Structures are given as C-alpha cells and as structure tokens.
Swiss-Prot record:
Entry keyword Flavoprotein: no
Any one Gene Ontology molecular-function term assigned to this protein's record: O-phospho-L-serine:2-oxoglutarate aminotransferase activity
Purpose: Catalyzes the reversible conversion of 3-phosphohydroxypyruvate to phosphoserine and of 3-hydroxy-2-oxo-4-phosphonooxybutanoate to phosphohydroxythreonine.
Keyword flag Transferase: yes
Family membership: Belongs to the class-V pyridoxal-phosphate-dependent aminotransferase family. SerC subfamily.
Coiled-coil annotated spans: none
InterPro entries: Aminotrans_V_dom, Aminotrans_V_PyrdxlP_BS, Pser_aminoTfrase, PyrdxlP-dep_Trfase, PyrdxlP-dep_Trfase_major, PyrdxlP-dep_Trfase_small
Protein's recorded name: Phosphoserine aminotransferase
Binding-site residues for pyridoxal 5'-phosphate, renumbered to this chain: 77-78, 103, 153, 172, 195, 237-238
Gene it is expressed from: serC
C-alpha cells in the first residue's frame, strides 16, 4: 500500500499488511456469520476455532512439547513480573535474576515482594549496553529458577545464545519471540506480550510446563493463578478475543513464509544491513557491545543530540517513523521486528548515508 509509512517503533509494531486487510474484513463480518469478530461470543464455535487454531500454531512453530500448556492471558507482560514469582516462589524460596535492562529491573522489583531474589548480574553501570556471558555470573544453588529478558528493546541488546543453567529457566521474550529458534524444553516458563511480533496489545502469551501448575501457593488469587487459566483453556473469563485472533493470523502468515527458521534468516539479514552501515562510519555508533547486539532493536547515536533530532525529523518527513530512542538513553532506535519489511531497512540505510554526507559533525 503506497501511503503506508515504515514504522520503526518499539511497539506496537508493524504487522503484516495482509493480516490487517483480513482483520478489517473480519471485524465487520466474521466468516459470514453476519456479526463482527469483536461481537461474537467467546463460547461460540467460531471463536473456539480461532483460539484452537492460534494455540496449534504456537505449538507447531515453536515446537512446544506436549507437557506444556499454552495460555492467552490479559494484563500485559508487566503483569507477569509478579505472576511468575507469585506462582513459582513459595515462602522462604529464592530465585536468581539477571538485570540487563529496564524490564528486568521492573521484574526484580516485583519478585522481591514474594521471595528472596538474588541479582546475580547487572549491566546497569554500563547503561545496560551488554548481556552477560554464561561464566559472568553464578546461579544460587537454592534458586527455584533463573529469570532473564531475552531481548532488551530500550538498549538494543539480546542474548545471542540463551543462558545455560541446571536451574529452570524463566524468560521474558516479549520482543523477540518467534524471531529465532528456541528450545522450549529448556524453559519452565516463557511469556511474551503480543505487541512486538505477535499482534496488537491486549494478550500475553504464556508457555508453562505442566508440573509447575501444581506449585501455585494456595493463597494465590484465582485470576492470578496459572492453573486457573490452564484448567479452563484460557477462558476462565472472557479472553481478549480480537488480540488472540490477530495473533493467529500473524502466526499463519509466519508459517506460510517458512516458519521460524525462515524468519530468523530474514531477521539476521535485515539487522546485518543496518549494523554494517553503522560500523562502516564513524558518524554513527551502536549502543550495544559486540556479542550483545539485538536483531530486533538497533540502538545508535549520532555525534550530537542536535543532529539526532534533525535526523529523526528528516526521516519522519520521508515516511520513516518512530526512530526516536527511549527517553532513558536518547539517541535513535530502529525496531525491525518480524513483519518489518526489508525494503524499509534499505531505505533507512540509504538515508543514513545521505544524512551523514550532508550534515558533517
């Protein structure tokens, strides 16, 4: 579509255009029912088919083992910051956390309300410009789990390989789920807000190993218990129907593209185009250290804040939107999630070359 902009925003993010087109039709008349998708009952056969299709695609594309439940919850990924320890930590129990950015730090704060939290590593002193190697921290022997955020949108860092531990892994994959291959069997729990790679805000995907459902303390509020939602197929109460529907459509698009293996190849190519341009010039500099660079969020600076402001304004005028960095570190950020088109990255790279030539430091 000619008048669509390139949306480099960290989220909500670009969705496949064909998904938007289909959603536009289905929101008016879903499957010739005479009702819009957001009007039909969540107990209707039509919506049961939607949620079952979406779960099936999650399982297929991520190769989720049979001994895991797939849940579609509300409250955003931020609610998982307290739901995880509320469900997995009993009185007097300990968990280990890696502090690699704002969202991990928020999760640590919430977890401290429920148990003894050991922060085994923090990159805060270096403005979260890297994630740790496996030998840079130790997981407490008595820990119930090791928690980390696989990708950090604000700082543009990502675990190139997932942490290794004898302890159960718990991961916030909100900004890179389905972007690369992941061995789900290595994790006790994975969660992800939808608005980066999966659809609109409103639904949070949780993948949890069956045995953990029995660990929930008896005093846990009903709505905050994973077991409640697992037992009811994510329909203890009315689920976020539209967000689940869009997730299913996005995953169907991903499957038709070639699945996670193919999108990882595409994502690596897009990121390489952008990082190569930055590395080839002294004009731009990446915030993240080598070995920690994100495939999803490329954060970079120009020589001065004034040039950054001009860069963002001129890019916006050329239909490249959302390049302003997070307020906590400034600079620029190009978020290039799964559905972000390669031609948008090429256009940005070409603009970066022209801008540097026309605006010497």
């Amino acid at each position: 579509m000619a008048d669509r902009v390139y949306n480099f925003s960290a989220g909500p993010a670009t969705l496949p255009f064909e998904v938007l087109e289909q959603a536009g039709k289905d929101i008016v008349n879903f499957k010739e029912t005479g009702s819009g998708l957001i009007e039909i009952s969540h107990r209707s056969p039509e919506f049961i088919e939607v949620i079952e299709k979406t779960e099936s695609l999650v399982r297929e594309l991520l190769e989720v083992p049979d001994n895991y439940k797939v849940l579609f919850l509300q409250g955003g990924a931020s609610s998982q910051f307290f739901m995880v320890p509320m469900n997995l930590l009993g009185a007097g129990k300990k968990a280990t956390y890696l502090n690699t950015g704002t969202w991990a730090k928020k999760a640590i704060k919430e977890a401290q309300l429920f148990g003894d939290i050991d922060v085994a590593y923090s990159s805060e002193e270096s403005i979260f410009n890297h994630v740790p190697a496996n030998d840079a921290y130790q997981v407490a022997e008595e820990s119930e789990y090791l928690y980390f955020a696989s990708n950090n949108t604000i700082y543009g860092t990502q675990f190139e390989t997932m942490p290794q531990s004898k302890k159960m892994l718990v991961a916030d994959m909100s900004s890179d789920i389905f972007s690369r291959k992941v061995d789900v069997s290595k994790f006790g729990l994975i969660f992800a807000g939808a608005q980066k790679n999966l659809g609109p805000a409103g639904v949070t995907l949780v993948i949890i190993r069956d045995d953990l459902l029995e660990k929930t303390p008896a005093h846990t509020p009903t709505m905050l218990s994973y077991k409640t939602h697992a037992d009811k197929g994510s329909m203890f109460n009315t689920p976020p129907c539209f967000a689940i529907y869009v997730m299913g459509e996005v995953l169907a698009w991903l499957k038709n593209l070639g699945g996670v293996e193919k999108i990882e190849e595409i994502n690596r190519e897009k990121a390489a185009l952008l990082y190569s341009q930055i590395d080839a010039s002294d004009y731009y500099r990446v915030h993240a250290q080598d070995g920690s660079r994100s495939l999803m969020n490329v954060t970079f600076n120009l020589p001065t804040a004034e040039l950054e402001a001009k860069f963002i304004a001129e890019a916006s005028a050329l239909q490249m939107k959302g390049l302003k960095g997070h307020r906590s570190i400034g600079g620029c950020r190009a978020s290039i999630y799964n559905a972000f088109p390669r031609e948008g990255v090429v256009k940005l790279v070409e603009f970066m070359q022209v801008f540097a030539a026309n605006n010497p430091a």
